[in-house]
Amino acid sequence: MTETAFIVGESLVDVVAPPPPGPTTEHPGGSPLNVAVGLTRLGRRTQLATRFADDNHGQIVRDHVESNGIQLCPSSDEALTTATATARLASDGQASYHFDLTWDLPRLDIPDEAIVVHTGSIAS
């Protein structure tokens, strides 16, 4: 049995929209996803229970999860849409935020090999 950190919570795409003519950028994010990435980079086996869709934003999340060696729980990729957090920056530097997310994680069993369970943000 390999000891595992079991992480529960949102993964999303951070959309940063600066004032024109700056380009809008998109980055994988979400506090629980970031925790899973950090633990994996520290050498801990990590399993993530999250929700994202089979869409363009979901592919950003999936690529980030896979490139960091995080194990996804079954059905993590079955959401209708992938959550986004959009930050719009005004020319004076003020930011306004819009969150487009739902949280509908199905019932989960904590894996026997989990030595720690972390829930974050929306999951808590």
Regions found by a protein language model. Give the residues of each.
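Conserved N-terminal subdomain of the carbohydrate kinase-like
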Residues: 45-121
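Glycine-rich phosphate/adenosyl-contacting loop at the front of the ribokinase-like
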Residues: 1-71, 85
